[in-house]
Structure formats: structure tokens, C-alpha cells
Design a protein with these regions (language model features):
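Residues immediately flanking
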Residues: 1, 14, 48
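Surface beta-strand/loop "capping" patches
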Residues: 168-195
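Single conserved hydrophobic/aromatic residue that forms the stacking wall/gate
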Residues: 1-9
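C-terminal catalytic region of ATP-dependent kinase domains
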Residues: 37-173
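Catalytic-loop signature of eukaryotic-like protein kinases
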Residues: 23-35
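Conserved kinase catalytic-core helix
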Residues: 10-24
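Residue-level detector of short, conserved catalytic/binding motifs and their immediate flanks
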Residues: 18, 29, 41-42
Length: 195
């Protein structure tokens, strides 16, 4: 049914976003649903303060770790839902195609870097007041340095995001190219509109 398909796409897009902007704080997850079950469980994307901490980050490796991921307190956080989905061949096949589709056509540097720059331009005039009032960041030059690092990470991310996908799904270059052709077909079917 169409609604279930949309829900599955949203859940995949959630995981794609967590991976693309490597947000290793996957221990803090929240989900919601309606009490009448007209809307089934959906992930809530929030608390992304660990995102973009490294352009090389591999969050998929944590979500698909059947042993569990060690928490700071020594306990293991289990990602049973995602491990179960990963073991489903149909889900994995569509996830790979969707991942390439989203990262190639929407989370690419032609789109993200201008968006990032516009966000920086929006808050830049307020930074001196921010620093004067709160003392954080410690100086304007420190803030500019951090912005430069974030931009560099964002610019380098496409290459590493591809490598993470290939590693976690054991994809050769030839297999990746096959999935990329399917992603291109998906883009053409959607008329270049994100769906």
C-alpha cells in the first residue's frame, strides 16, 4: 500500500541522513506513532550535535552491528530493528538504491555547500553579540575556523559516504554502478523531483 511505502521511504531517509551527516549519537533515538495506529512508528530526527564530527564517519556500521554498540557506561545499545531490516534482501536492495539516489541528487556539494554558506551568512552578523554575551565560541576567529572545518568536512563527505555504503553492503565498483543506474532511473521516473 502507498502509505506503507512512504513510511518505509521515510525510515530509510532517516537512516541515510544519520549516515550522510555522520551522527554517531545514535544512542539517543526517539520514535513516535499515533495511538490509533493510523500512523505507525516513525523515527524522529533530532539531537544531531555530534553530526559532521568527521567526514569519514561510518554510522551504518553501528546501526547494522548485531553484537551491539558499546555505550559510554559500558552497556551495549542494540539496534535490533535496523539489523533485522538489513537482513532483509528486498529492504537492503531498495536502501542501497535510495541511498545513492538521495546522495547523488540531493545531498551533493552543488546543493549542500551553497545551503551551508547561506546558513553561515545568516548567523554571521550575530556572532560578535553571541561571543560578547555568552563567551562561546571563544572568539570570532575560532568560530570562523570551526566553520571552515565543517565546510571542508561537508565537501569531502560524498567520497566517504560512498565508501561507507560499499563497505557495509560489501559492494564492488561494478555492483555500485548497477545500483547507481537504478538510482538514475528512480530520478528520471520522479521527473527530477524528490520523492
Amino acid at each position: 500500500d502507498r502509505r506503507q511505502r512512504q513510511m518505509c521511504i521515510r525510515d530509510r531517509d532517516y537512516l541515510i541522513a544519520r549516515e550522510y551527516f555522520p551522527d554517531a549519537d545514535m544512542f539517543n533515538q526517539k520514535y513516535w506513532r499515533t495511538t490509533d495506529y493510523k500512523v505507525r512508528w516513525r523515527a524522529i530526527f533530532y539531537d544531531s550535535d555530534f553530526a559532521l564530527s568527521s567526514e569519514r564517519g561510518d554510522v551504518l556500521g553501528h546501526y547494522f552491528n548485531v553484537v551491539g554498540v558499546p555505550s559510554a557506561d559500558g552497556s551495549l545499545s542494540q539496534m535490533d530493528l535496523y539489523c533485522g531490516l538489513r537482513s532483509n534482501e528486498e529492504w537492503s536492495d531498495y536502501f542501497i538504491t535510495r541511498y545513492i539516489y538521495v546522495t547523488k541528487y540531493y545531498l551533493n556539494n552543488d546543493r549542500l555547500l551553497p545551503l551551508f554558506d547561506s546558513m553561515v551568512d545568516t548567523i554571521q552578523p550575530e556572532m560578535d553579540r553571541q561571543i560578547a554575551r555568552w563567551g562561546r565560541p571563544e572568539s570570532r576567529s575560532h568560530w570562523e575556523n570551526e566553520i571552515s572545518k565543517l565546510r571542508s568536512m561537508l565537501a569531502a563527505r560524498p567520497q566517504y559516504a560512498k565508501q561507507c555504503l560499499q563497505y557495509n553492503f560489501k559492494l564492488s565498483e561494478a555492483q555500485y554502478a548497477e545500483y547507481e543506474a537504478k538510482a538514475d532511473e528512480m530520478f528520471n521516473q520522479n521527473g527530477g523531483v524528490f520523492k
